[in-house]
Amino acid sequence: MNDRIIDFDPLIEGVLIKRYKRYLADIALESGEVVTAHCANTGPMKGLLREGAKVRISVSTSPKRKLPFTWEQICVLDEKNEEVWVGINTLFANKLIKKVIEKNLLDEIIGEIETIKSEVPYGKDKKSRIDFFLTPKSSNPDKRNIYIEVKNTTWIRGNVALFPDTVTKRGQKHLIELKELIPESKSVLVLCITRKDACFFAPGDEADPLYGNLFRESLSAGMITIPCSFEFHKDHISWRGIKPLK
């Protein structure tokens, strides 16, 4: 399975010099020029950061941007010592998952969809926002509305993708709120695995034990978990299918 999900202008290749202040990275281009790129992923990026690694960046012509370059991908080695490109722009995850929903690639799990809305307020105080709020088609036997929370996933151990890679209070809160929606609504956690070498998904207990416990509690309560895998290229992203839980 290697379906193209998103196409874009070819990215610029370079080499990582260093990442600093969490949201900045100095990158040496093939021309020899050194540029500073914005890093949307402010987490530890466990298992990814290595000075001298090959990277890919995009460029924006918007005059509103302080930095025209955005760090999009990094190249790492898998278990077989083969190159794997990993998508590290966390802002891209929702765009990818929306494409997957629109292409009906999740229908077998969540049913056929009538409408998709983004960033809809939910929870007891309505102060949280769900990534996607879906309504089912009238022909769908399950009439419950669907709440989808998306998590960008880059960390891997062997062939198991793991989330989170650090303690995430926000992620813990999301699991609690998803659990509270059950059974009146359908709660779905989608893991956007931005690398092709993952065969399974599991919660990152080592990084955040409480998140792992909350994940299993929510799963037992009826939360649906869908680990979606993608392969990243210089000018497009491909769908690699849904991976099982470990």
UniProtKB/Swiss-Prot annotation:
Pfam families: SfsA (PF03749), SfsA_N (PF17746). InterPro entries: SfsA, SfsA_C, SfsA_N. It comes from the Bacteria. CDD domains: SfsA-like_bacterial (cd22359). One of its GO terms (molecular function) is DNA binding. Belongs to the SfsA family. This is Sugar fermentation stimulation protein homolog. The gene is sfsA.
